[in-house]
Amino acid sequence: MFETSADDLILEKLIILYTFNNLREDVTDSQLTQIIMETDAMNYFTFRALLPKMLESKFITKYQSLDTDLYSITQSGLEVLVYFQNRIPEYFRNKILDYIVNHDEDIFSSKIVRQAKYSSQDDKYVVTLILNQNSR
């Protein structure tokens, strides 16, 4: 369906690493997807296929914070980026940086809502709600 050469896959991995390296904090899957799709850096299917491969290669890592999966670049990913960043065309570097600068508030203002409902005695319930809105 989508033919992608080895050189294209390398470039697309570098673009993902470059994106991580220029974010002010770690991001969720949906935040990263938003950035990649809005900048037209690659097609959705290639991006979805590369993410697990990059986790497996330990270029990026995924961890949980407040029951939310977050992604970040690893030391190995940074080292690869330092050596090969010059392979990313200036057009993509500028487009990603411009998007991050101009949409920083949109990217990081997402709300994380978690709730849990527990039954208590006498048909009463205990509800726990966590609302976390990232801010500058």
Language-model regions, residue ranges each:
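A short, conserved structural fragment
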Residues: 55-65
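Short, cationic-aromatic polyanion-contact patches
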Residues: 65-87
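Exposed, interaction-prone assembly regions rather than primary DNA-binding/catalytic cores
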Residues: 94-136
